[in-house]
Structure formats: structure tokens, C-alpha cells
């Protein structure tokens, strides 16, 4: 599939071919949700953990007889009712995490997300930025002229610093490296802008059957 490249410097538009093996994929909502859940669970490590009554150190002996005292029935002092007892329904730490996910599943999800963005006409490929620039005014004008507000920019290492400097004060714009390309950020923002070098890297990675 052919894409017309956007040009930050305002020169002539070039084209790039991206494999139909990526761009013709159908969007699987269940698969995408599974991968996003995995990603979010690993972004915020849940370290908080409380002891339940079976984990509290102490005797399991009843504190007094079942009958004859005139008081409410109780078991041991490890019950959540007592000070020093276990915590009822408290956080369990890493138990909530999805431990592993297949690499191929992540690749398929990324490819499907790119195809979805293309179908919705929200995928834009940008010519590599050869000159250094760090003015927000120039970059903001480019975004407005191309109606690219609320956008995620996936950049190669050579261009990343320029984008970070020029886009850090623009609302609803985020810059990430192609190595950190992920479906959560891609779906969070309306438009997806990928530099030419980054697109080639991502395409090669997705089509590589060995990894």
C-alpha cells in the first residue's frame, strides 16, 4: 500500500510502500484488549500487600469458649475484627498481574492497530527530519496546517530530540521512540505520526517471522 509522505520542511511529497500483510489486517477487539490489559498492569507494579488471617503469626486457639460467656462468638485473635488480626479483602500485590504474553501476540496486535489507524485515515508517515529544529512555533504550524492535533509521534533516534524539544509545550502531543511503540499510546491519541525510518523499522520487525 502506498503512502504520501508528509514533509516538515514543505518540500515535494514522496511516497512509500508499506506491506499489505500489515495494512490489510482486521482489528480483533478481544486481542487488543488483552494486550492493553497486559501493558497497563505492567506499567504500574502493584506492590501493596496486606496479610490475611491465615498469614498472620499467632495461635489459632479460640479466645474463649463458644457458649456460656454471654459474649459474641469468636475464633482466634487473627480474625480481621481484632487489632493485629488479618486484613479482610486487602490488596494481594503481584497476584493481579498477567505474568506473560506471547511475543507474536504483541506483534499481531501492533500490526492490527496500524491497520486500524490506516483504515480510519489517522496514520501519517513523515519524511525524516534532516535539519535540526527546536522551535515550537514551526512544529505547531505544521500540525495545524495538516490538522494533526491530538497526535502520537513515533520517531527514530536521530529525530527524537528535535521532536521532544519542539513538541513538549504543545497540548495533546506525545513523542516516543520506535523501540517503545505500543498499541495503548497509538489508540489513546487520535492521530498517529511515524517518521519514515521508524516506519521501515517497525515494518521489518513485524514481518520478521523469526522473532
Residue ranges of predicted features:
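Glycine/serine-rich anion-binding loops at beta->alpha junctions
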Residues: 53-91
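Extended polybasic, low-complexity segments that bind anionic RNA or targeting/receptor surfaces
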Residues: 1-45, 92-211
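A short, flexible low-complexity segment enriched in Lys/Arg and Gly/Pro that occurs
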Residues: 29-67
Amino acid at each position: 500500500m502506498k503512502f504520501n509522505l508528509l514533509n516538515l520542511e514543505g518540500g515535494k511529497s514522496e511516497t512509500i510502500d508499506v506491506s499489505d500483510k500489515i495494512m490489510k489486517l482486521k482489528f480483533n477487539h478481544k486481542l487488543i484488549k488483552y494486550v492493553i490489559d497486559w501493558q497497563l498492569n505492567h506499567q504500574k507494579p502493584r506492590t501493596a500487600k496486606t496479610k490475611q488471617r491465615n498469614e498472620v503469626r499467632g495461635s489459632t486457639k479460640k479466645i474463649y469458649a463458644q457458649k456460656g460467656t454471654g459474649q459474641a462468638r469468636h475464633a482466634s485473635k487473627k480474625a480481621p475484627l481484632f487489632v493485629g488480626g488479618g486484613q479482610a479483602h486487602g490488596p494481594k500485590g503481584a497476584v493481579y498481574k498477567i505474568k506473560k504474553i506471547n511475543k507474536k501476540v504483541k506483534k499481531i496486535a501492533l500490526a492490527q492497530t496500524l491497520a486500524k489507524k490506516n483504515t480510519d485515515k489517522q496514520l501519517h508517515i513523515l519524511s525524516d527530519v534532516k535539519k535540526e529544529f527546536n522551535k515550537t512555533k514551526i512544529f505547531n504550524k505544521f500540525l495545524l496546517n495538516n490538522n494533526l492535533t491530538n497526535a502520537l509521534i513515533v520517531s527514530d533516534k536521530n529525530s527524537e530530540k528535535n521532536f521532544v524539544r519542539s513538541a513538549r509545550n504543545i497540548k495533546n502531543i506525545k513523542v516516543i521512540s520506535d523501540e517503545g511503540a505500543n498499541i495503548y499510546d497509538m489508540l489513546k491519541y487520535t492521530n498517529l505520526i511515524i517518521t519514515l525510518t521508524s516506519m521501515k523499522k517497525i515494518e521489518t520487525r513485524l514481518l520478521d517471522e523469526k522473532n
